[in-house]
Amino acid sequence: SLVGSEMCIRDRVKIYLGEAGGHGIDSGETAATIHCGSLGIIHGSRTLVMQDEDGQIIEPYSISAGLDYPGIGPLHANLAQEHRATVMAVNDEEALRAAYELTRLEGIIPALESAHALGMLPRMKFRKEDVVVLTVSGRGDKDLDTYLAHRYDENLE
């Protein structure tokens, strides 16, 4: 049955979401809405929102303009609420390091938004037989000014 096959897939397929941690989820400068938001309404959707006690929007922060948003899509909020997805807040530095590594190793310049997904990888453990699918969308060349302004030099560590 479809329900049975859906349960089989649910047991075998793990979903990980990377959200923009900015300077850290405790810094006050973050866009990690799943970690730091609360239930509210934004742009007609009831979802998690970065807001104060009165429901007023709190300005989020992320190095990525595309992730610098005070809400989260209802689908992602539901995946987190139902414990169907593991959500990690990826800070700016982690995203930049991951972007530089992908560029160095593969010659692919990821958009800053996708760099946050890449930034989760160092924290994760995989088995040799695991199949990992990670989407890299957008064009990193639009973010070159940001990458150059925050140049990561692996020799400084």
Regions found by a protein language model. Give the residues of each.
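Catalytic phosphate/nucleotide-handling subdomain of diverse soluble enzymes
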Residues: V13-G18, D26, M120-E157
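Active-site/ligand-binding loops adjacent to catalytic centers
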Residues: L17-I108, A149-E157
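A short, acidic, amphipathic alpha-helical segment used as a generic capping/interface helix at domain edges
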Residues: D92-R97, H116-F126
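Short, small-residue-biased leader/transition segments that mark boundaries at the very start
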Residues: L2-I9
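Short, electropositive, low-hydrophobicity segments enriched in small/polar residues
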Residues: P70, A111, K142-L144
